[in-house]
Amino acid sequence: MTRLTLALDVMGGDFGPSVTVPAALQALNANSQLTLLLVGNPDIITPLLAKADFEQRSRLQIIPAQSVIASDARPSQAIRASRGTSMRVALELVKEGRAEACVSAGNTGALMGLAKLLLKPLEGIERPALVTVLPHQQKGKTVVLDLGANVDCDSTMLVQFAVMGAVLAEEVVGIKNPRVALLNIGEEETKGLDSIREASLMLKTVPTINYIGYLEANELLTGKTDVLVCDGFTGNVTLKTMEGVVRMFLSLLKSQGEGKKRSWWLLLLKRWLQKSLTRRFSHLNPDQYNGACLLGLRGTVIKSHGAANQRAFAVAIEQAVQAVQRQVPQRIAARLESVYPAGFEPLDDGKGVNLRAHR
């Protein structure tokens, strides 16, 4: 394994350095080839490194940034006032080649806007999308995008997301000829928003995409598709609803419950079932797949959940390591031309629609 360097926006997220710094130390323990640039306020970060040993400190560097973008800041205002913030400095380290990826739990809209401004989208991509890989009940994985980077998406953007998701599923996850579906409120052709129906017509004309039609939200974890595409608003609500249900389910499995006194053998059976079911469904724990890749950029950016705990943020760091090692941006770029060559214009309602981003 070759050495790699990541830039962490340690000031971002609901809990800031109290979570991100311990998670950084956890990541260093797990990967001896990793170097981390901790971007933020040195006066806050330094005391949290008191437990770091000499070997860990040799692979850590604090990069000063005195301000932070608030989680509730409007993206446009945050971007205009972003100079010197921990998020922007972390992204600039990637742009300058001092780091190979950036990890942030900060403001999603600001991260997307700054990443697009500083790192630039790949040729043929209009806007990046947040993507994650979720486990499903068939013991496989499903690529899901967009998860919140773009609230409003037209049909062309949805098709671009489908292209990127399919390439990611094939090149990184290892799924041959991945099935691609659009998230919708029904499977009938007449269902859904105009943008979804138009995207469906367009995807049917792309010969290199294995498009299978619409999928409803209740089938997200069934394994019926390898890539699920939606706008950022729908994707974010769907993901967080699923996370909430899974957390509640796992919590119920672990709880002792209430009720009358039971015999010792019933209590023993209950505890055995709790442990067995908890192990069986532990792979669905949202902490284990925290970290959404901002797909479609010329560099690697990982967005952690704002409410991530130490374990979850450490997982996001590992996601960044894997994305760099698997050369995700390079592989996406290499495949885009073969997926829809320059000038390719599929038809939807009789009008030519160019899938390539207009520059």
Swiss-Prot record:
Keywords: Cytoplasm, Lipid biosynthesis, Lipid metabolism, Phospholipid biosynthesis, Phospholipid metabolism, Transferase
EC number: 2.3.1.274
GO biological process terms held by the UniProt record: fatty acid biosynthetic process; phospholipid biosynthetic process
Membrane-spanning ranges: none
Any one Pfam family match given in the protein's UniProt record, by short name: FA_synthesis
Subcellular location per the Swiss-Prot or TrEMBL entry: Cytoplasm
Protein family: Belongs to the PlsX family.
PANTHER family given in the database record: FATTY ACID/PHOSPHOLIPID SYNTHESIS PROTEIN PLSX, PHOSPHATE ACYLTRANSFERASE
Entry-linked Gene3D superfamilies: Isopropylmalate Dehydrogenase
Protein name: Phosphate acyltransferase
Quaternary state and interactors: Homodimer. Probably interacts with PlsY.
The protein's role, per its UniProt record: Catalyzes the reversible formation of acyl-phosphate (acyl-PO(4)) from acyl-[acyl-carrier-protein] (acyl-ACP). This enzyme utilizes acyl-ACP as fatty acyl donor, but not acyl-CoA.
Pathway(s) served: Lipid metabolism; phospholipid metabolism
Cellular component, GO annotation: cytoplasm
Gene Ontology terms, MF aspect: phosphate:acyl-[acyl carrier protein] acyltransferase activity
Root EC class: transferase
The reaction(s) this protein catalyses: a fatty acyl-[ACP] + phosphate = an acyl phosphate + holo-[ACP]
